[in-house]
Regions:
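Active-site-proximal or metal-binding-adjacent scaffold patches in catalytic folds
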Residues: 1-189, 199-239
Length: 239
């Protein structure tokens, strides 16, 4: 009971900090009627509706736990977007640092997984184990240790989007279409490798994700050419 009350009090304090931060900075930016609330979006995003000197913000609840400085930097970035006078993008150095912290992942990864409907929440597949693929990549020296990352097969057999990840949440998804005796194990390993490269790169606001350097690293996988051919065949397979 005490733990629940403490959690509710903490949430209330965080919401109060959010409102105070956005309202005080709103006045400095010409908005005298400001509302701000946390919203349970699956991905990290925020929305706003503006009318004259009024503005309503819905802020990703993954920002719960951020300190006042991070909230202020984020609010300033959003107001900059509204006025068109701020820096490009919403990711300040303090925000990037905090979202790359272990505390951020520990707080938010379980929430993100709960909101992800197309994940089995298991690295064990019917045929292959993504944890084994990760260990194989480590033994080959292709990836660094990533102890916070979680690997999941998808529920649906995606043919074109065979892998994706949340760099923020350290979550990797590999399409279950690759979890088959008809598909060699190195194909899912290659897809996992691709996504782990993104996680290793971390947040890269306003930069290309698949640049020349990334493609060169991707091709360090010894079976990249065969894997790409497999992925092309699977993508063109009739539904």
């Amino acid at each position: 009971m005490i733990t629940i009350l403490h959690y509710l009090r903490e949430c209330s304090d965080m919401t109060a900090d959010l409102i105070y931060t956005f309202q005080s900075l709103g006045l400095a930016n010409g908005y005298d009627d400001v509302e701000a609330e946390f919203a349970p979006f699956k991905e990290f995003k925020s929305t706003w509706k503006r009318s004259g000197h009024s503005v309503r913000f819905q802020i990703s609840d993954y920002l719960r736990g951020a300190d006042r400085r991070v909230l202020e930097d984020f609010a300033n970035s959003l107001y900059g977007c509204l006025t068109g006078e701020g820096p490009r993008g919403i990711y300040s150095d303090s925000l990037i640092t905090w979202m790359g912290s272990k505390d951020f992942v520990n707080r938010n990864q379980p929430i993100y997984l709960k909101r992800s409907r197309n994940l089995t929440l298991d690295h064990h597949g019917q045929v292959y184990d993504l944890q084994d693929a990760y260990l194989s990549l480590r033994e080959q020296g292709l990836v660094r240790a990533c102890p916070d990352a979680v690997f999941n097969w998808t529920v649906r057999e995606n043919r074109r989007r065979v892998g994706y990840c949340s760099v923020l949440m350290k979550v990797v998804a590999v399409s279950s279409i690759l979890d088959s005796v008809d598909v060699p194990s190195y194909v899912s390993e290659y897809v996992l490798y691709h996504e782990l490269l993104h996680i290793e790169d971390g947040m890269r606001p306003n930069r290309r994700h698949h640049d020349k350097n990334f493609r060169n690293r991707e091709r360090l996988h010894p079976r990249w050419r065969e894997s790409e051919e497999w992925l092309r065949r699977l993508a063109s397979r009739p539904v």
